[in-house]
Structure formats: C-alpha cells, structure tokens
C-alpha cells in the first residue's frame, strides 16, 4: 500500500509549511489527483486519517480533486479523453501522449 508513504509525505509537507507560516492548526488540504496516477483515492484517505493523528493536522479535511486523463494525438494535435480505439478519430494516427491525469499535487492548504 504505497498510499501510506504518500500520505506520510503529504502530512510532512503540510506540517513543514504550517510551521513556516507559524500556524497553530491545519484545517484542510486540497490535493489534485490524476485518474492515471496509480493512486487509490480511498486508500489515500484512509492512510491520511492514520498519519494525521497526533499532529496539528489531526482534524484536517483532505479534499481530493480528481483530474481526468487527457491525451493528445502526436500527429495532428487532437485532444481527447483516453482513446477507446488505438487510432485517432481525427487523423487515424495511433501515436498518443498523456497530457494530464498523472498529477499528485498538494494544491493548497488552509491553516489557522
């Protein structure tokens, strides 16, 4: 369960930022999580609930924004969600590049 190590890193980063801001409490964390990031959002939430205990993030809410995968045809530039077929519907090419959907980013946090 690599979500535990991700949650640990997330909380450690948030705690460091909170100390820098001289905050007393972390209220919420907003995370951008791509659908192709290879991270189970519910497992991450569970791991976060374990790691946040006994810290100034103990009552923090984890808000996860899901980022859908988006591909771009490398031949014609057509943007598309994950292609169901191997060929681009616009030009017939099978050369795709993932443009978004692998994000795992702490977008913002609220502290007091």
Swiss-Prot record:
Q: Any keyword rRNA-binding?
A: no
Q: Which UniProt keywords apply?
A: Metal-binding, Nickel, Zinc
| Pfam name, any one | HypA
User: What domain of life does the UniProt record list for this protein's source?
Assistant: Bacteria
Does Metal-binding show up as a keyword for this record? yes
The Gene Ontology biological process terms listed for this entry are: protein maturation; protein modification process
Q: Where does Zn(2+) bind?
A: 73, 76, 88, 91
Q: Which GO terms describe its molecular function?
A: nickel cation binding; zinc ion binding
InterPro entries the record matches: Hydgase_Ni_incorp_HypA/HybF_CS, HypA/HybF
Q: Which residues bind Ni(2+)?
A: 2
Q: Which HAMAP family match?
A: HypA_HybF (MF_00213)
Q: Which family does it belong to?
A: Belongs to the HypA/HybF family.
- Purpose: Involved in the maturation of [NiFe] hydrogenases. Required for nickel insertion into the metal center of the hydrogenase.
- Which NCBIfam families does the entry link to? hypA
Name of the protein described by the UniProt record: Hydrogenase maturation factor HypA
Gene name as annotated? hypA
């Amino acid at each position: 369960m690599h979500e535990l190590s991700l949650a640990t890193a997330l909380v450690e980063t948030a705690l460091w930022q909170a100390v820098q801001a001289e905050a007393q409490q972390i209220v919420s964390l907003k995370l951008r999580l791509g659908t192709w990031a290879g991270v189970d959002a519910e497992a991450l939430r569970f791991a976060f609930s374990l790691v946040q205990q006994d810290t100034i993030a103990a009552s923090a809410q984890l808000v996860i924004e899901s980022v859908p995968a988006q591909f771009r045809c490398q031949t014609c530039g057509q943007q598309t969600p994950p292609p169901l077929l191997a060929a681009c519907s616009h030009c017939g090419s099978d050369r795709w590049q993932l443009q978004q959907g692998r994000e795992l980013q702490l977008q913002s946090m609220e502290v007091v």
